[in-house]
């Protein structure tokens, strides 16, 4: 048995392959795709399923399907009989239709082919059916009857049944089944075109002949009906006019439903007139040819409309299509829901990202910011406050979704039973050169002064001292005015402050500052009056001066503990420590050692062999080797722990200062050190802090207002001095950088473009060469390759060990950038007593020097009646006949003015010179 593909089967049936697959599935044939093979016998099984009710579906529109019953087989009579019947009875008028139409039963299938071309042409016009003279029984199928029966008298006819129209059914679009056999036509369409034609009804093109039923129930051929239809009168309406409804009423067909009213209207108005022009055979032939000619353009037009049904762009006229196309191209401004009008940011957001989230062009946001006085670009970061103001103008709300890292790292309060006593942390503070380090040296019984440049402590130190079995942790802070931040930091992490005041010097500025820092931190103060061994020492005067700051000695009725000591002679040191321990006992200092460690970075540096090294003061818990930790924007794992004497230890408890190795970078002094169990959590927190810090810096640098821009334009002559600062420890680098920034003035601006801990490297030299910068090294040296590169590139490297030397040199360098100040220096004056005219030279003033001296090539001004009429220089100076360099007071001389001859007797010539004086900051 031969097989056929589903796609070929669908093409034969004029259907889509999806419809064929669905039909095959209904009859039990398994076919999955269009390329599946099925038996040819399936075609026979498929035919009944295509039209189970014997009805043909004609799609008029995309949603309306008109069902029309198929006609029964008709036995066509002979042509002669047809002619006789046409001559015997003309067409009679149709009675009015009853309001209630009866049901129309289904009929047998009609013959698929027409007999001849004239009959085919008549079939096209057979939708208007002549009214039958006799009633038709609806139950019996139509059979062939004698032609003579058609001549029955009309008076005996029963009442004419009303015209039955097929109801218009609105349903979802379904594939329309087309008859497999269509009448042969000269312009036969292709398979694809056949599918399209089968989906909708084409007015004027009918694929089966329409029957004319006589009174006896017989069916006449379509050609007979075409001859019997009367031709219109002379005043009949034209092709496009509305037809006469009384002449177009079709008779009721027993076996089939009549065409719809819309079809009759189209047919009657457009196709009836051409067929009525001729008579007889010639009329039929001419009518058929005319119908074919006029049917072609209508077919293309209808096909085009049919195709446009499936394309929403082509609905309606071309003008409407263009309008719809232009409307679709326009940007629709939609208002998002309230929940979508909330923008969530983390601290800051860029202008471009904010515009993207609000669905607004970035240029519009930039314009709004310019109106607010901010000059920004699309990549500038906006802080939370600015974002709230800007978003509110466009109807948006902003939520700050920044992660509070303090809440993540915040520890729960310890239970009282878990707390144990801890050693006190004592910070030594005071004015420069009052003996702070000497006192600590005496307490530690170690010489730490030798390492201090110029006797000045330039970084903070942490030491652990044991006295009578009890430990005390000491923090030594600098006393120089530049180290204010260090003193403030030391006051925050300490329990007790020892204020060192020299007995021979009294209260000084840094002493007052230390008192203020201690009071601000709420830390008790123990005053150590040092240098009492000196003959000029006056401790009573010191106590009296301290009373002005609220520190009253206990022997005077106050609450301040004051101890007179001598660091050099080691006098009364134990008494000082006992007072410190007594104060600690009163404070009841306790901590929980059985928890994760938490502390503060006292100092940090970059060691060439060990990497980043941080001095940590543990405040809570116990720090152990191998712990994961996070410090500021850095994280890491504790690789090694060393105490203040350089000994390696495995753990550090509360109030113990240690050096920690293993961090990813050099942290800032004052950062909080937190120990964690999870390395992943430590890295995440460090990453979040880095992002937050970067966003804040971007927002800080991007805030340029119109006023600032105007000031920069106005002060275009401002000089810039760029420096790179490298130091041994982070605290010293911060102090040096801050000291340099304070030197900036309106005339010279100092920019610290880079700062870091460690030796001066090639990277630093490359940066300095690219940015025309000098490098300041504080207690560090350049590498060998860096030194060679600096000499090659011409980069200036300055090395210092004392901070105020670096500040003074940078200040001088800034002064060198300034233009010198011009100062006028008076030389002398001479009175013109005679005027001599010398050819080719001009007028020479015979003058008498009254005051000072006259110098050749000096600047001069000519005064007449004390009014300056000329200012230039002396071109010549002669004494008698000789050219001289100068003429002193009391002598006569000849003076020539450069390019000026309008001199008179009695004028005064005043000589002066311009001196350039270096500008001071």
Curated annotation (Swiss-Prot):
Residues 96-112 have a biased composition (Pro residues). It is found in: Cytoplasm. Residues 81-118, 175-194, 219-301 are annotated as: Disordered. Keywords: Cytoplasm, GTP-binding, Initiation factor, Nucleotide-binding, Protein biosynthesis. GO terms for cellular component: cytosol. Residues 292-301 have a biased composition (Basic and acidic residues). PROSITE patterns: G_TR_2, IF2. PANTHER family: TR-TYPE G DOMAIN-CONTAINING PROTEIN (PTHR43381:SF5), TRANSLATION INITIATION FACTOR IF-2-RELATED (PTHR43381). This is Translation initiation factor IF-2. The lineage of its organism: Bacteria, Pseudomonadati, Thermodesulfobacteriota, Desulfuromonadia, Desulfuromonadales.
């Amino acid at each position: 048995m031969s097989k056929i593909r589903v796609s070929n089967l669908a093409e034969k049936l004029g259907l889509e392959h999806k419809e064929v697959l669905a039909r095959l599935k209904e009859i039990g044939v398994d076919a999955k795709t269009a390329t599946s093979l099925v038996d040819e016998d399936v075609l026979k099984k498929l035919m009944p399923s295509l039209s189970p009710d014997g009805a043909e579906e004609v799609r008029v529109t995309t949603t309306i399907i008109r069902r029309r019953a198929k006609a029964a087989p008709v036995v066509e009579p002979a042509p002669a009989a047809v002619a006789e019947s046409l001559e015997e009875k003309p067409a009679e008028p149709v009675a009015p239709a009853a309001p209630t139409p009866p049901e129309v039963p289904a009929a047998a299938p009609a013959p698929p082919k027409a007999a001849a071309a004239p009959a085919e042409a008549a079939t096209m016009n057979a939708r208007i059916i002549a009214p039958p003279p006799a009633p038709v029984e609806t139950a019996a199928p139509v059979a062939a009857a004698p032609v003579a029966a058609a001549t029955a008298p009309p008076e005996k006819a029963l009442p004419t049944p009303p015209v039955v129209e097929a109801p218009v059914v609105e349903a979802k679009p379904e594939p329309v089944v087309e008859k497999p056999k269509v009448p042969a036509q000269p312009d036969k369409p292709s398979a694809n075109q056949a599918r399209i034609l089968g989906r909708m009804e084409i007015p004027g093109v009918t694929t089966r002949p329409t029957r004319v039923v006589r009174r006896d129930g017989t069916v006449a051929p379509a050609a007979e009906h075409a001859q019997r239809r009367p031709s219109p009168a002379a005043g009949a309406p034209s092709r496009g006019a509305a037809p006469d409804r009384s002449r177009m009423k079709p008779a009721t067909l027993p076996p089939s439903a009549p065409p719809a009213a819309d079809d009759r209207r189209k047919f009657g108005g457009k196709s009836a007139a051409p067929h009525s022009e001729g008579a007889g055979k010639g009329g039929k032939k001419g009518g058929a040819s005319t119908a074919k000619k006029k049917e072609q353009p209508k077919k293309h037009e209808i096909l085009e409309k049919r195709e446009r049904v499936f394309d929403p762009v082509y609905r309606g006229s071309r003008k409407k299509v263009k309008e719809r196309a232009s409307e679709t191209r326009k940007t629709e401004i939609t208002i998002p829901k309230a929940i979508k009008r909330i923008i969530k940011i983390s601290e800051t957001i860029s202008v471009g990202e904010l515009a993207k989230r609000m669905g607004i062009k970035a240029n519009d946001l930039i314009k709004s910011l310019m109106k607010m006085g901010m000059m920004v670009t699309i990549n500038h970061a906006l802080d939370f406050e600015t974002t709230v103001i800007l978003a509110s103008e466009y109807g948006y709300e902003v939520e700050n979704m920044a992660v509070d890292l303090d809440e993540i790292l915040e520890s729960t309060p310890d239970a009282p039973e878990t707390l144990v006593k801890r050693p006190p942390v004592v910070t030594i503070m005071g004015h420069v050169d009052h003996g702070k380090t000497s006192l600590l040296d005496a307490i530690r019984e170690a010489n730490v002064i030798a390492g201090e440049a110029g006797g000045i402590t330039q970084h903070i130190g942490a030491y652990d001292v044991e006295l009578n079995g009890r430990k005390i942790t000491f923090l030594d802070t600098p006393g120089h005015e530049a180290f204010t931040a260090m003193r403030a930091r030391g006051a925050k992490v300490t329990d007790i402050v020892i204020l060192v005041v020299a007995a021979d010097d009294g209260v000084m500025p840094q002493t007052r500052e230390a008192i203020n820092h201690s009071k601000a931190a709420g830390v008790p103060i123990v005053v150590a009056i040092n240098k009492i061994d000196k003959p000029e020492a006056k401790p009573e005067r010191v106590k009296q001066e301290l009373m002005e700051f609220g520190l009253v000695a206990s022997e005077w009725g106050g609450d301040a503990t004051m101890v007179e000591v001598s660091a050099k002679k080691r006098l009364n040191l134990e008494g000082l420590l006992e007072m410190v321990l007594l104060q600690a006992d009163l404070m009841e200092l306790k901590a929980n050692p059985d928890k994760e460690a938490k502390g503060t970075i006292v100092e940090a540096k970059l060691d060439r062999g060990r990497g980043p090294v941080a001095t940590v003061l543990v405040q809570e818990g116990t720090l152990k080797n191998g712990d994961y930790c996070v410090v500021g924007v850095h994280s890491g794992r504790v690789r090694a722990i060393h105490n203040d004497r350089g000994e390696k230890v495995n753990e550090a408890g509360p109030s113990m200062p240690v050096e920690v190795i293993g961090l990813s970078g050099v942290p800032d002094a004052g950062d909080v050190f937190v120990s964690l169990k999870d390395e992943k959590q430590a890295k995440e927190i460090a990453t979040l802090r880095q992002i937050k810090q970067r966003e804040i810096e971007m927002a800080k640098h991007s805030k340029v207002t119109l006023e600032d821009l105007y000031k920069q334009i106005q002060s275009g002559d401002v000089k810039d001095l760029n420096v790179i600062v490298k130091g041994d420890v982070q605290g010293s680098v911060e102090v040096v950088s801050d000291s340099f920034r304070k030197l900036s003035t309106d005339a010279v601006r100092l920019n610290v473009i880079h700062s870091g801990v460690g030796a001066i490297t090639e990277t630093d030299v490359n940066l300095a060469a690219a940015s025309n910068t000098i490098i300041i090294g504080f207690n560090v040296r350049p590498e060998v390759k860096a030194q060679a590169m600096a000499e090659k590139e011409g980069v200036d490297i300055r090395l210092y060990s004392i901070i105020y030397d670096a500040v003074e040199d940078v200040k001088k360098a800034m002064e060198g950038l300034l233009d010198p100040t011009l100062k006028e220096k008076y030389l002398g004056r001479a009175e013109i007593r005679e005027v001599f005219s010398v050819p080719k030279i001009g007028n020479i003033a015979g003058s008498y020097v009254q005051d000072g001296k006259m110098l050749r090539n000096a600047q001069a001004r000519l005064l007449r009646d004390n009014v300056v009429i000329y200012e230039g220089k002396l071109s010549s100076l002669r004494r008698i006949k000789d050219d001289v360099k100068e003429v002193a007071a009391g002598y006569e001389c000849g003076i020539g003015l450069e390019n000026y001859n309008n001199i008179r007797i009695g004028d005064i010539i005043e000589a002066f010179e311009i001196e350039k004086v270096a500008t001071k900051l």
